Amino acid sequence: MTVRKVLCVDDSAAELVLIKKIVLSANLDFISATNGKDAIQCAKSEMPDLIFLDIVMLGMDGFAVMRELQKDPATKDIPVVFVSSKSQKADQAWAKMQGAKGFVPKPINEQAILEEIRKF
């Protein structure tokens, strides 16, 4: 699979700006959502090739978003990479158990984001 369109979900405007810069520098399309509900709707309407998903968000957290995406046949195969300050081994293991294909700890490192994109 070739990644052409990336959805980034984070309730932090600063994090979205940073990831947007990285994604655009790789000549990819960038779309964003700032909460879980919008993330699910955006994933269904935009059908991105990859989702970078924050774990800690108000309302619906990243794990709940992941479960909803996996329930829907249209979105269940979109790879999700969690991006979070919750980066202890237990958090990473839980993310993998939820179906995540990768994990990038915050603060965000440009190389880590680009490596995740290259995986797909």
State where each predicted segment sits.
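Receiver (REC) domain active-site loop signature in two-component systems and cognate sites
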Residues: M57
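Short hydrophobic/Thr-rich beta-strand motif most characteristic of the beta2 strand and flanking loop
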Residues: N27-T34, C42, V104
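Active-site beta3 strand of CheY-like receiver
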Residues: E46-F52
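C-terminal output helix
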Residues: V17, I108-I117
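Two-component/phosphorelay signaling modules centered on CheY-like receiver
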Residues: A13-I31, K119-F120
